[in-house]
């Protein structure tokens, strides 16, 4: 990225609203500089007092559980929803691997502050959050045996389309609202795939991808296993899990972490380690067979899909060659968050929301006032000229259009 682009991005960010102040702590973060090492971060008893779960009220109006049978699987998709009003748009959010729909909770609330008629749909992907996938037995009952993990891009694409259409049916919407797709990390790959295949038709206004680029994503996969081996596999309590996310700077906003992290962990009924009964809902190591398929061809699809395009990045040097060329050609909007971590929408929800709302307004077709057609302008001019001359319109003798005969 050029120095000009960097300075432009910083100037744009300076105009955005400030983030709310973090939750105060009684103990200073004197060891924050060590937060980049996820292996050495351990929760402290004092800080756990400030890492309590924050709840989900106030972020979405309701939760839906959408049942679906796919071959031998019974799937219940869990959806957080605030319906649009007065012809407002619907922002459809898709989280990243290992996360949940609550990753967008604070951002959703900020969007509604700026654009009160907007709707927000944020679903838990299969095998994430409260979305369940179980094998169905011959008698139609759920089989306790664990279903085979399938997080391929095609599967996640179809899941998202089902959630959108089933939500429409459940809520009794005659037609879908205008849609803005928003995806973080893996979610960015999913919404780009949906946009490229055009299955939402003209209802898709635009799509926004948060902090994922094909080139850097493919490079990062090489070190993913090392990262997963360094993070804790279990926690003594839910507050300690929240604190790990903030101390390691995985999520840099404590308010966001208190809302989103509880959906990432669950308490084992019979813990393998009774001193640490809280474990991850999604085993990211088991998703390895799908990693490459998520991101191959992402940049090309992002540039080729129809609709407005927005790319939000946490760093200034993550563009691959295709995206650099596309940026120079003005094919998409780029925003850089130099002070955010990977979870842009959680670290800086107010700024993310402002950019998303501005992006929607820029692509809102209902707000466009098209210039009159040339033919209409010519016809109008001819009518005015004829009226000014005081000559009645009619047909020449012989029934064909021509000069008019005065009586």
Curated annotation (Swiss-Prot):
Keyword Hydrolase: yes
Reactions catalysed, as given in the entry: [phosphatase 2A protein]-C-terminal L-leucine methyl ester + H2O = [phosphatase 2A protein]-C-terminal L-leucine + methanol + H(+)
Keywords on record: Hydrolase, Serine esterase
GO molecular function, one term: protein C-terminal methylesterase activity
InterPro entries: AB_hydrolase_1 (IPR000073), AB_hydrolase_fold (IPR029058), PPase_methylesterase_euk (IPR016812)
Any Pfam family the entry gives: Abhydrolase_6
Disordered: annotated segments: 1-53, 388-407
Function summary: Demethylates proteins that have been reversibly carboxymethylated. Demethylates the phosphatase PP2A catalytic subunit.
Protein name: Protein phosphatase methylesterase 1
Protein encoded by which gene: ppe1
């Amino acid at each position: 990225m050029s120095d000009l682009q960097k300075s432009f991005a910083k100037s744009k960010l300076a105009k955005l609203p400030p983030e709310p102040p973090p939750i105060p702590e009684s103990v200073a973060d004197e060891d924050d500089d060590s937060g980049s090492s996820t292996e050495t971060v351990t929760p402290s008893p004092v800080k756990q007092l400030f890492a309590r779960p924050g709840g989900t009220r106030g972020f979405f109006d309701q939760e839906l559980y959408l049942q679906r049978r796919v071959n031998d699987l019974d799937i219940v998709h869990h959806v957080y929803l605030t319906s649009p009003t007065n012809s407002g748009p619907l922002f459809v959010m898709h989280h990243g691997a290992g996360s949940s729909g609550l990753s967008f909770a604070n951002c959703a609330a900020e969007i509604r502050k700026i654009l009160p008629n907007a709707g927000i749909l944020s679903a838990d992907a299969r095998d994430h959050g409260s979305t369940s996938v179980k094998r169905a037995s011959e008698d139609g009952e759920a089989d306790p045996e664990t279903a085979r993990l399938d997080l391929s891009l095609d599967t996640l694409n179809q899941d998202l389309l089902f959630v959108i259409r089933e939500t429409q049916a459940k809520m009794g919407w005659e037609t879908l609202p205008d849609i803005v797709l928003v995806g973080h990390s893996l979610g960015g790959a999913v919404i780009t795939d949906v946009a490229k295949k055009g299955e939402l038709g003209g209802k898709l206004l635009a799509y926004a991808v948060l902090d994922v680029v094909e080139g850097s994503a493919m490079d990062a996969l090489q070190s993913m296993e090392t990262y997963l081996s360094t993070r804790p596999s279990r926690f003594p309590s839910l507050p300690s899990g929240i604190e790990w996310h903030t101390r390691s700077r995985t999520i840099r906003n404590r308010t966001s972490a208190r809302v989103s992290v509880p959906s990432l962990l669950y308490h084992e009924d019979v813990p393998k380690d009774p001193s640490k009964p809280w474990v991850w809902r999604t085993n990211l190591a088991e998703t390895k067979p799908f990693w490459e398929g998520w991101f191959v061809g992402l940049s090309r699809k992002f540039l080729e899909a129809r609709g407005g395009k927005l790319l939000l990045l946490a760093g200034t040097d993550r563009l691959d060659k295709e995206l650099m060329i596309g940026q120079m050609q003005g094919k998409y909007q780029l925003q850089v968050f130099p002070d955010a971590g990977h979870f842009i929408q959680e670290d800086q929800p107010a700024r993310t929301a402002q950019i998303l709302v501005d992006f929607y307004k820029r692509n809102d077709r209902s707000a466009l006032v098209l210039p009159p057609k040339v033919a209409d302008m010519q016809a109008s001019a001819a009518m005015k000229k004829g009226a000014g001359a005081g000559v009645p319109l009619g047909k020449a003798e012989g029934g064909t259009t021509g000069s008019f005969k005065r009586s």
